[in-house]
Amino acid sequence: MSTPTQLSYKDAGVDIDAGNALVDNIKTAVKRTHRPEIMGNLGGFGALCELPTKYKHPVLVSGTDGVGTKLRLAIDHKKHDTVGIDLVAMCSNDLIVSGAEPLFFLDYYATGKLDVEAATSVVKGIAEGCVQSGCALIGGETAEMPGMYEGDDYDLAGFCVGVVEKADIIDGSKVVAGDSLIALASSGPHSNGFSLIRKVLEVSEADPQLNLEGKPLIDHLLEPTKIYVKSLLKLLEQTDVHAMAHITGGGFWENIPRVLPEDCKAVVKGDSWQWPTVFNWLMENGNIAEFEMYRTFNCGVGMVVALPSEKVDAALTLLNAEGENAWLIGDIAKRNGDEEQVEIL
């Protein structure tokens, strides 16, 4: 009887040394995200965070999200350095809607075979997103799972926790007819609608390198999601915001009603902005109806803010000074009966 071959974890497809190399590669990037409330270092069994002392009655706000099938395009085009920013943006932009300051972030990276270089790029992007959001990257999980993913495929999930003063929670309850709506421009499709985007690319047989306003189509599509946290935190310090809506999956039709009282509707002036070229390209090459565009994509608007009309000028001045492209997009009106809660003129 022959002696059985001695097996190792690596023989089964899990390379512990590669995982350790990844941790070494990301340490400097992670340190850039540090906040004074964070206790301990990367690598513990659990990450510790004190509550900031400035809050009298702190309320924790949590969120989790992914990047969706935007990852498919990123993997196919070997563009790994921006999807981490997308991941943080999808979570932290959801938190700021409640008025919450993001505190810390954790990520989950799963793959069949760990590509240290690609994973390093992804996590460095996550760290950059945390810097832009002002939160600490305090931990994560890298799962190498042979047999679960094909080839170079990987998946991402993010988890973010923030804090808001209890008296300052923004939940839409203060919204009234007569309030104004301010739009903050998106950087592109952000991280939603990519199954439809990929279908448009398929049926149109478009060249991803097609020049669109001076840069390749694929670069427009993979442009990282805009993070609005720091500019909106400054806005909250200076004015009374009644509601905010992060325009993600479901577009205008699904997201704005989430923050409106039942007796209010949003009246959006469709001629108050021009869609970025990439959305016009998608609409034309996919033969997509306008309603479907607004239901699927942000169409150039990544965040909508509701506030008293007399606060609009000061808010626009502040937001544009902070580097946002912000404008008056509409107002809040009284809703009658079973009217839709979003009307686009």
Curated annotation (Swiss-Prot):
Annotated family: Belongs to the AIR synthase family.
Enzyme category, top tier: ligase
Main location, first listed in the record: cytoplasm
Pathway in which the depicted protein is active: Purine metabolism; IMP biosynthesis via de novo pathway; 5-amino-1-(5-phospho-D-ribosyl)imidazole from N(2)-formyl-N(1)-(5-phospho-D-ribosyl)glycinamide: step 2/2
KW Nucleotide-binding (keyword) present: yes
Pfam families per UniProt: AIRS, AIRS_C
Keywords: ATP-binding, Cytoplasm, Ligase, Nucleotide-binding, Purine biosynthesis
HAMAP family with a match to the protein in the record: AIRS
EC number: 6.3.3.1
GO biological process: 'de novo' IMP biosynthetic process; adenine biosynthetic process
Catalysis: reaction(s): 2-formamido-N(1)-(5-O-phospho-beta-D-ribosyl)acetamidine + ATP = 5-amino-1-(5-phospho-beta-D-ribosyl)imidazole + ADP + phosphate + H(+)
Cell compartment(s), UniProt: Cytoplasm
GO CC terms of this entry: cytosol
InterPro entries: PurM-like_C_dom, PurM-like_C_sf, PurM-like_N, PurM-like_N_sf, PurM_cligase
GO molecular function, one term: ATP binding
Name the record gives this protein: Phosphoribosylformylglycinamidine cyclo-ligase
Gene of this entry: purM
